[in-house]
Amino acid sequence: MGQWHQVAVVVVLRQVDQQHPLAFAQVLLHDRLTPLAAPELLARHAPLATPADLLALPLLRTPLQPWAPWLRAAGLAEAPEPDDGPRFVDLGLTLAAALRGQGVALARLSLARHELAEGRLVQPFALTVPAERHYGLVCHRPSPAAEAFAGWLQAHCRAVEAENSSAGG
């Protein structure tokens, strides 16, 4: 990210945790994670009856979202973090690979909501887990304009969270 606070940047949107070190950081979206796959990928494999069946499919990996929390929540505490298969450093690339049928992505509902609504991705299991990091607004020097923008953006993000909750979150 560099020295953005030394230039004329008012706000930055990025992934943050609850204890962000800057003076003004607000979590905008408490996202949820769930496995998502292209219908074509699932049609090429045996039906997924239980979450354990996912382990037979290629699991798309990213260091930004480890599979272990979802696997534990699904009752697969003994399943190791996948260490083979495609690995991506960008959440958008991971989602794009899932859309191409390259594997199952552990995806943020906020990023995939349109693909889910259009049926281009499916959620094989209703289980979701909270994301460990959240989208947030960071401002080095708070200002009335930054706070007004944050309020407007938070209202939009609350609507997305409500949509995610009704879609299986």
What name fits each language-model region?
Residues 8, 77, 120-123, 139-140:
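Short low-complexity, flexible loop/linker segments enriched in glycine and/or proline
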